[in-house]
């Protein structure tokens, strides 16, 4: 009988202590943040009061108006108005300007070359009537059948395009039509653009350029065809009734 009473009292005491600890954790701490009325330093007479009495014409510790420790108008520690540590008016710390300019982050500068290049590329593609500009490629290593042509190509390959113009693959019935159109528009556009800059191409240049661009157009067709079929497979997959039913069920579980 005595043991049961002792056990009950121990249980009650444990519950009371647990409740008190929980309340203490939820209870907000007295006082406030910085400068909310409480004293940060010992020896102050009244709560919320200043350690030193205010003097005429200023805030706490200001003999002549201004920030703390200012004999004249200005920022903290400014004898004549200016940035911190500045003997005379002017800029932020170490330079001209106001006190508020100390830590202003500098605005990122826009690279005007990139903007101009992007705008020019967009104008060219838009002016070609629906053609798109492919990504840059490495110029292929091609053998033309003679040592002279092979050497000429290695020495002048940088003058030939490394990007091709093309239309979506679904507008063509086969690869040959895509490549033929891609080669014609790319060689024509590159020739006109380069000739405008004062550089001319010989017949050998045109011959080599067509071979190089043909290889790049074939590569571009393979990339676009693969991406096109992948998009089509994704559409078919997500439009099938079982997948639609599964997605609807998952949405119902999440919302419900």
From Swiss-Prot:
Glycoprotein is among the record's keywords: yes
GO terms for cellular component: Golgi apparatus; plasma membrane; side of membrane
Keyword Zinc assigned: yes
Chain positions covered by the region annotation Interaction with GRB2, ERI3 and SYN1: 25-233
Membrane topology label: Lipid-anchor; GPI-anchor
Alphabetical list of InterPro entries matching this protein: Prion, Prion/Doppel_b-ribbon_dom_sf, Prion/Doppel_prot_b-ribbon_dom, Prion_copper_b_octapeptide, Prion_N
Biased composition (Gly residues): 58-99
Domain of life of the source: Eukaryota
PROSITE patterns: PRION_1, PRION_2
Cell compartments where the protein resides: Cell membrane; Golgi apparatus
Region (5 X 8 AA tandem repeats of P-H-G-G-G-W-G-Q): 54-95
Lipid-binding residues (covalent, GPI-anchor amidated alanine): 233
Annotated GO MF terms: copper ion binding
Pathological association: Variations in PRNP are responsible of transmissible bovine spongiform encephalopathies (BSE), a class of neurodegenerative diseases that affect various mammals. These diseases are caused by abnormally folded prion proteins. BSE can be subdivided into at least three groups: classical, H-type and L-type, with the latter 2 collectively referred to as atypical BSE. Susceptibility or resistance to a BSE disease can be influenced by at least 3 factors related to the host prion protein: protein expression levels, number of octapeptide repeats, and specific polymorphisms.
Biological function: Its primary physiological function is unclear. Has cytoprotective activity against internal or environmental stresses. May play a role in neuronal development and synaptic plasticity. May be required for neuronal myelin sheath maintenance. May play a role in iron uptake and iron homeostasis. Soluble oligomers are toxic to cultured neuroblastoma cells and induce apoptosis (in vitro). Association with GPC1 (via its heparan sulfate chains) targets PRNP to lipid rafts. Also provides Cu(2+) or Zn(2+) for the ascorbate-mediated GPC1 deaminase degradation of its heparan sulfate side chains.
Domain notes: The normal, monomeric form has a mainly alpha-helical structure. The disease-associated, protease-resistant form forms amyloid fibrils containing a cross-beta spine, formed by a steric zipper of superposed beta-strands. Disease mutations may favor intermolecular contacts via short beta strands, and may thereby trigger oligomerization. Contains an N-terminal region composed of octamer repeats. At low copper concentrations, the sidechains of His residues from three or four repeats contribute to the binding of a single copper ion. Alternatively, a copper ion can be bound by interaction with the sidechain and backbone amide nitrogen of a single His residue. The observed copper binding stoichiometry suggests that two repeat regions cooperate to stabilize the binding of a single copper ion. At higher copper concentrations, each octamer can bind one copper ion by interactions with the His sidechain and Gly backbone atoms.
Record protein name field: Major prion protein 2
Source organism: Tragelaphus strepsiceros (Greater kudu)
């Amino acid at each position: 009988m005595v043991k049961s009473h002792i056990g009950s009292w121990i249980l009650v005491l444990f519950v009371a202590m647990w409740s008190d600890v929980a309340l203490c954790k939820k209870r907000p701490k007295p006082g406030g943040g910085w400068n909310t009325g409480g004293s940060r330093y010992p020896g102050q007479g009244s709560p919320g009061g200043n350690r030193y009495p205010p003097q005429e014409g200023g805030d706490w510790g200001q003999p002549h108006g201004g920030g703390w420790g200012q004999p004249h108008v200005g920022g903290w520690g400014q004898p004549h108005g200016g940035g911190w540590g500045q003997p005379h008016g002017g800029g932020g710390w170490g330079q001209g300007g106001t006190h508020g300019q100390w830590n202003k982050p500098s605005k990122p500068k826009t690279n005007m070359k990139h903007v101009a290049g992007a705008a020019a590329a967009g104008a060219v593609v838009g002016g070609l009537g629906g053609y798109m500009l492919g990504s840059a490629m490495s110029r292929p290593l091609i053998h033309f059948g003679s040592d002279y042509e092979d050497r000429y190509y290695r020495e002048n390959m940088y003058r030939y395009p490394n990007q091709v113009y093309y239309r979506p693959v679904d507008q063509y019935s086969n690869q040959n039509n895509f490549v033929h159109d891609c080669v014609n528009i790319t060689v024509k556009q590159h020739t006109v653009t380069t000739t405008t800059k004062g550089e001319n191409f010989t017949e050998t240049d045109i011959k080599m350029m067509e071979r190089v661009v043909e290889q790049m157009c074939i590569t571009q067709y393979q990339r676009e065809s693969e991406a096109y079929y992948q998009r089509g497979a994704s559409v078919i997959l997500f439009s099938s009734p079982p997948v639609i039913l599964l997605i609807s069920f998952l949405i119902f579980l999440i919302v419900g």
